[in-house]
Amino acid sequence: MKEVPKEPKKLREGYTTGACATAATRAALLTLISGEVQDESTIYLPVGRFATFHLEECEYRTSSAVASIIKDAGDDPDATHGALIISEVSWCNGVDIIIDGGVGVGRVTKPGLPVPVGEAAINPVPRKMLKETAQQLLAEYNIQKGVKVVISVPEGEEMAKKTLNARLGILGGISILGTRGIVVPFSTAAYKASIVQAISVAKASNCEHVVITTGGRSEKYGMKQFPELPEEAFIQMGDFVGFTLKQCKKQGMKKVSLVGMMGKFSKVAQGVMMVHSKSAPIDFNFLAKAASESGASAELVEEIKGANTASQVGDLMTQSGHHQFFEKLCEYCCLSALKEVGDGIDVDTSLYTLKGDFLGQAVQHGN
């Protein structure tokens, strides 16, 4: 009997820090108003549906109330998965709703972010959710008082070390984020948003030259190559080469330096702008053509066509002394980048080995 293949398990969605903070705030304010401790909290998410959160803690105090929720990021656990998100709500003078961050919520120290310098790193959509939730409850109970909401994350400062917050100038903790309220497993939206934010910070720091890398290792090599540039100028693009280049052009960068290694940059050279391992295979015929243009023998060209990895091709060209091959590959990367974004920006590309040995560089000037 033929075995029926199992359907892949559907990945479970999670909730953003912004959604958790909002649900905790609703519970805390309801407790403050009614004097009754809550067990759970239901809110309406920006994505267009209701969600109910279990409360880890809910406490009524003399002049305030506190509620907390453990963030569940679903089947795509991020740096803040398992974070305890606490909201403390208290009455204040006037009728304003004041939103601030406490322990473990970062504070903005650099321009270029959607939150002004000096403010707690609670992004615009979560701020709106917090404010509207408080306004709705106050209206429901016909209360005309001011409310202060303080969001805290006890382990936030430690968790922030696994994020780009320090690079972006967000110090002291994590950011309260989320535009939809939910975390979609393995979504690229969050990573792309972080790229846009990093470029904005670079621009606000008066950087006109940025270095974009595929990860931490290539960034380290780039920092050694361009020691004159500030930390804000270095941006990890991951696999999103085309997207990052377009954002650099859109935000007015004058020069972009690509720094990376053979595997992913072999794809960029052949015109692939999304370099995930599953997005497109390495074209070894293309690498063989570049090798031939660099003076490689017919025998070596055939060996390259039968190679298994781009790193293997790099080793073959290094061992045979064809160092101009790497410059040729960098030249192709620059041409691919300019084809992607058009003129008006200068592009240079540098190639390194996994161990950090410099292989080659090329520059192309956009008209």
Swiss-Prot record:
GO molecular function, one term: cobalt-precorrin-5B C1-methyltransferase activity
Keyword Nucleotide-binding tagged: no
Catalytic activity as recorded in UniProt: Co-precorrin-5B + S-adenosyl-L-methionine = Co-precorrin-6A + S-adenosyl-L-homocysteine
Matches recorded under Gene3D superfamilies: CbiD-like
Pfam families in the cross-refs: CbiD
Entry's family note: Belongs to the CbiD family.
Protein name: Cobalt-precorrin-5B C(1)-methyltransferase
Originating species: Priestia megaterium (Bacillus megaterium)
